């Protein structure tokens, strides 16, 4: 969100809420360690109307002196968690990486208690292990803590937010940690197999949009051919972004799709994409073309082009 003040951050959250967004994703490290506190202030304004995801696994960066909130606070989502509240949400841009946690029960308990305090709530809706890998899940007491925290009403559910390959390894060996799985997915990725986990996807656009747009602009013949097949001008950045976002929604129709924005107009536009059924057919066709004509190896090149 650039160099935003606390007031500006709260204002963009209020704008997102006005558009129907009522689930917010955050982490202790976001906003140089201040994002949970700001989100907590916002949540307190709307008691019983907002749900929250936060995480344990990457500590906040340690900075001396006063630090203004210079990043987004939470990622907008365009689907809601079944059984919680229907809605869309906003999400925080990351601060600098402050290292990785030990993924022990004692450390996790301290992190959870801090998050509950910062968020000014007695219960966190979704609590994720942040960037955890299979090798990190060595402490059986950590799983017990998460299960006991659900039973105690401190969290509603839990899971892992990590890379897709790490999620797949955990699902194969330690599925008990994965009631919820959060990972990146865009039209450049293969379809996700059916899983028992509730899925949260992110990065449908960002560098994936920039890379694909650049490739299409450099290959005018393909851009023209695909535009005709899709029925939309793919040289238009708004059209391309809308179809990429819609395809990501269609890939995870019962889950959550996260996106970040510092612009209330962009948030409004993304909400409109979620509600526009006429985009479904062209979005599916775009995804089919990418999967048929861009190999997995080349998809990495498309991302790199961004």
Q: Which role fits each region the language model picked out?
A:
Residues 36-48, 111-118, 193-196:
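Short amphipathic alpha-helices and their capping/turn segments at secondary-structure boundaries
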Residues 60-98:
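Alpha-helical membrane-targeting segments
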Residues 51-55, 77-87, 200-207:
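Non-cysteine beta-strand/loop elements that form the S-adenosyl-L-methionine
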Residues 1-7, 94-109:
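Active-site mouth loops of central-metabolism enzymes
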Residues 1-74, 151, 305:
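N-terminal binding-site loop/beta-alpha segment at the start of enzyme catalytic domains
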Residues 12, 103-116:
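Short, well-ordered amphipathic alpha-helical segments that serve as non-catalytic structural scaffolds
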Residues 8-15, 28-32, 113, 125, ...:
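Beta/alpha (TIM)-barrel catalytic core signal, keyed to glycine-rich beta->alpha loops juxtaposed to Asp/Glu
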Residues 20, 120, 154:
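Conserved functional loop/turn residues at catalytic and ligand-binding sites
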């Amino acid at each position: 969100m650039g160099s935003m003040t606390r007031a500006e951050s709260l204002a963009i959250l209020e704008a997102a809420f006005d558009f129907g967004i009522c689930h917010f994703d955050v982490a202790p490290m976001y906003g140089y360690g201040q994002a949970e506190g700001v989100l907590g202030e916002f949540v307190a304004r709307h008691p019983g109307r907002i749900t929250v995801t936060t995480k344990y696994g990457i500590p906040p960066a340690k900075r001396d002196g006063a630090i203004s909130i210079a990043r987004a606070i939470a990622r907008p989502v365009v689907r809601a968690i079944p059984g919680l509240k229907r809605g869309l949400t906003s999400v925080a841009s990351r601060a600098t990486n402050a290292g990785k946690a030990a993924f022990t029960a004692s450390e996790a308990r301290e992190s959870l208690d801090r998050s509950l305090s910062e968020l000014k709530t007695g219960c966190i809706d979704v609590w994720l292990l942040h960037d955890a890998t299979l090798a990190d899940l060595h402490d059986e007491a950590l799983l017990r803590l998460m299960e006991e925290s659900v039973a105690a009403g401190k969290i509603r559910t839990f899971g892992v937010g990590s890379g897709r390959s790490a999620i797949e390894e955990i699902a194969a060996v330690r599925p008990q940690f994965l009631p919820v799985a959060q990972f990146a997915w865009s039209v450049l990725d293969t379809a996700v197999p059916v899983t028992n986990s509730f899925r949260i996807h992110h990065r449908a656009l960002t560098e994936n949009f920039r890379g694909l747009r650049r490739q299409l602009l450099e290959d005018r013949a393909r851009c023209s051919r695909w535009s005709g097949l899709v029925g939309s001008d793919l040289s238009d950045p708004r059209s391309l972004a809308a179809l990429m976002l819609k395809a990501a929604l269609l890939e995870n129709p019962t889950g959550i799709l996260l996106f970040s924005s510092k612009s209330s107009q962009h948030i409004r536009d993304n909400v409109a994409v979620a509600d526009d059924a006429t985009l479904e057919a062209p979005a599916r066709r775009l995804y089919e073309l990418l999967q048929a004509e861009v190999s997995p190896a080349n998809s990495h090149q498309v991302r790199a082009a961004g």
